[in-house]
Amino acid sequence: LVGSEMCIRDRGMYQTKGGISGALEKLDPSENYRGTALEGLDAFSRQLKRFDIKVKGRNSDCVEKFFQSSNSAALFPEYVSRAVMQGMERADILPNLVATVTDIEGMDYRSIASVPSEDDKSLKLVGEGAKIPQTEVKTRENLVKLHKRGRMLVASYEALRFQRLDLFTVTLNQIGAYIARAQLKDAIDVLVNGDGNENPAGTLNVATGGKVTYEDLLKLWTELAPYELNTILASTPEMQKILSLSQLQDSNAGLDFQATGRMITPLGASLLHTPELESGKIIGLDKNCALEMVQAGGVVTDYDKLIDRQLERAAVTCTAGFSKIFTEASKVMSC
């Protein structure tokens, strides 16, 4: 692990692409450990074992274990980033909405768009030697709006000294969950109102105001064609109305829900409870072609000390935005 020791002394490695994990992997490749007791661990996890830092379980160490040396202290921001990312993944329903994720290194990104007419969608027969019809792909007029979300962690030396890493990880997980919900709210706003390129979602109304019927869901399904209705987002009141439908209350559905927690879904679509969605709205979309997520790096952690007040500080941030791919791949139903 000599190469890894040299790497973690340089905290500037956090600023490189891939962060300290990527830098450690280059100097200490995991493939070198095949067939050994350390197989299955990445370079960062091997560094934790090297410094005997236990981050989970009943015998987890206190946070101060990271600061027993300058080398081990350089691992602390990566531990924070991973714990926050773990919380984001647990609370994240964006994979059910996003067709693709684009990683960028700057702050300016312009997506592409193809807006085929009904004639373009027909894909007419092409005779021998005839010209093949074209579908234009253009860059969007406006840039994707990126939003920076984050939180500053501030703790006294005393709190860190006696805080178990297992419990501290739970706190970081919750911060990750907050970031995931904020990003979900951004995604919903783009689905409903568009990404600034004059592409808001088409709207339709339920047959009876304040009430959701199975016929309304069928209407949403037909209005979305030729796209596939595979995801439905519902606010809390609308979620209750949908689950109260007689079509979703047969005995088999009830037994499955009690046994596994899985709800029967209308028309085979994933039904997602979305408190971030405005009350009185239901969104139906084709997750395979509705939304693009753009992120500038992953979770970024910056760490420093305030000596005069004996405080440790860690700033955790994540920058991301959303762009519509095909406008007609999402519809909003007003209830």
Spans of features found by a protein language model:
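Extended, solvent-exposed, turn-rich assembly/linker loops in the middle of proteins
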Residues: 195-263
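Assembly/oligomerization interface modules of large self-assembling protein complexes
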Residues: 63-149
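Short helix/loop capping segments that flank catalytic or ligand/cofactor-binding pockets
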Residues: 122-124, 163-164, 241-243, 324-325
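Short, small-residue-biased leader/transition segments that mark boundaries at the very start
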Residues: 1-7
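Sequence/fold signature of self-assembling virion shell proteins
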Residues: 246-335
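Alpha-helical scaffold segments that mediate packing/assembly in large oligomeric complexes
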Residues: 149-224, 335
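N-terminal catalytic cores of peptidoglycan-degrading enzymes
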Residues: 9-101, 306-307, 311
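Hydrophobic alpha-helical bundles in membrane proteins
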Residues: 137-141, 163-164, 194, 232
